[in-house]
A protein has these predicted regions:
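Short S/T/G/P-rich N-terminal loop/turn motif that feeds into the first structured element of a domain
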Residues: 1-53, 59-70, 94-100
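C-terminal structural segments of small proteins and small subunits
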Residues: 65-92
Length: 100
């Protein structure tokens, strides 16, 4: 069953994010078979005061998300992402299947 990784964050260094993080993370997204459904620096808030950066990724499973996040080769990119963002919140959720 598919699983979704949902991240909200404020990107504090858009140039570094675009030029270093995004190209660096793409091979990991391919390796773990992630589909990028949403990637936006300026999402429109509808309620509350959320961070404007939103990323939604679909993975084949929750384990694939954990495997990417735990991949030793990903750790330098994670450190980079955390250094150029603020207010980051991430959740993982399984795909919803309508009962019946």
């Amino acid at each position: 069953m598919s699983a979704y990784f949902i991240l909200t964050q404020t990107v504090t260094d858009p140039q570094k994010y675009s030029e270093e993080y995004i190209p660096g993370v793409m091979p990991f997204l391919q390796k773990y078979k992630a589909d990028v459904l949403v990637a936006d620096f300026e999402a429109s808030p509808l309620q509350g005061d959320p961070a404007k950066g939103v990323v939604v990724l679909r993975f084949p499973s929750e384990q694939a998300i954990r495997d990417l996040l735990d991949d030793p080769a990903y750790q330098p990119l994670k450190k980079l992402r955390l250094s150029i963002t603020a207010n980051a919140n991430a959740v993982m959720a399984p795909e919803f299947k309508m009962p019946g």
